[in-house]
């Protein structure tokens, strides 16, 4: 894979007295990734079940990320020399009975920076301003071994679908779904006070009626437990060091009427 390089609108410069060096430059390098994937697909239980398993590995060179410079308000894109990601994905579906279908999707990911590289955490550097660039620079950290940004360690989507035909000739479909998203770090800094995005799990349910006259009526319940899960977060790298939080939608109850023609 390939992502082109580019130029930053804001970037740093080295101090004339040598007290600090630029960490965000006028240009940034292209990002490349070497990927490998091995998979297997298998049907069994007389064709009523199927499993797909994939194992993958990604090696990144010059991974692009949002970086902070010792000079205030000079954030931009920088490159991490080497990083890697590996994992496994499992898909499974089975017709348990004539009326019940079971579906499961699981994902496991491990990621890390695999080379020495120093970054500056804007959350820590924000306490210092113009004239204190050397103090900001002294806060830089080596992120070798840190998790890559926004790569959940575990994801799961499991559902059970029940379908039947009623005595009236209309059909009924019920779906019960469980979704889990594991925790991740929202920046490569891995600052536990702002970067850790915790896991969450939700339950969804729906009941649908398909009538013989091409009308359909669905009752839908999303996030049944009203879980206040955190979907993601983002910390500004350009100066104010503010962190914005994005939550998953609250409990939603919906009715949908549709007509096929």
Q: In which residue ranges do the predicted regions lie?
A:
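Surface-exposed loop and edge beta-strand positions of immunoglobulin-like domains
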Residues: 29-31, 41, 54-56, 81, ...
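C-terminal beta-signal and adjacent terminal beta-strands/loops
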Residues: 179-189, 209-261
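Surface-exposed extracellular loop regions of Gram-negative outer-membrane beta-barrel proteins
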Residues: 1-37, 47-51, 55-80, 117-119, ...
């Amino acid at each position: 894979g390939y992502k082109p390089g580019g130029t930053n609108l804001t970037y740093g410069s080295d101090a004339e007295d040598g007290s600090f060096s630029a960490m965000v430059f006028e240009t940034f390098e292209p990002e490349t990734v070497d990927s490998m994937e091995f998979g297997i697909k298998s049907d069994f239980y007389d064709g009523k079940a199927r499993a797909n398993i994939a194992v993958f590995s990604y090696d990144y060179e010059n991974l692009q990320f949002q970086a902070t410079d010792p000079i205030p308000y000079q954030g931009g894109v920088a490159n991490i020399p080497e990083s890697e990601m590996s994992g496994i994905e499992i898909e499974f579906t089975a017709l348990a009975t004539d009326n019940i279908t079971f579906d499961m999707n699981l994902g496991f990911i491990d990621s890390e920076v695999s080379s020495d590289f120093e970054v500056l955490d804007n959350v820590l550097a924000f306490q210092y301003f113009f004239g204190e660039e050397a103090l900001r620079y002294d806060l830089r950290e080596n992120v070798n071994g840190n998790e890559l940004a926004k790569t959940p360690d575990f994801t799961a989507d499991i559902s059970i679908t029940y379908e039947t035909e009623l005595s009236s000739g209309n059909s009924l479909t019920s779906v019960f779904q469980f979704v889990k998203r594991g925790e991740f770090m929202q920046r490569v800094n891995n600052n536990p006070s702002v970067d850790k995005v915790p896991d969450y799990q939700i339950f969804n349910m729906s009941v649908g009626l398909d009538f013989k006259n091409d009308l359909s009526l669905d009752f839908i319940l999303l996030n049944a437990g009203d879980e206040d899960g955190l979907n993601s977060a983002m910390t500004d790298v350009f100066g104010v060091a503010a962190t914005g939080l994005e939550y998953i939608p609250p409990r939603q109850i919906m009715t949908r009427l549709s007509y096929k023609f």
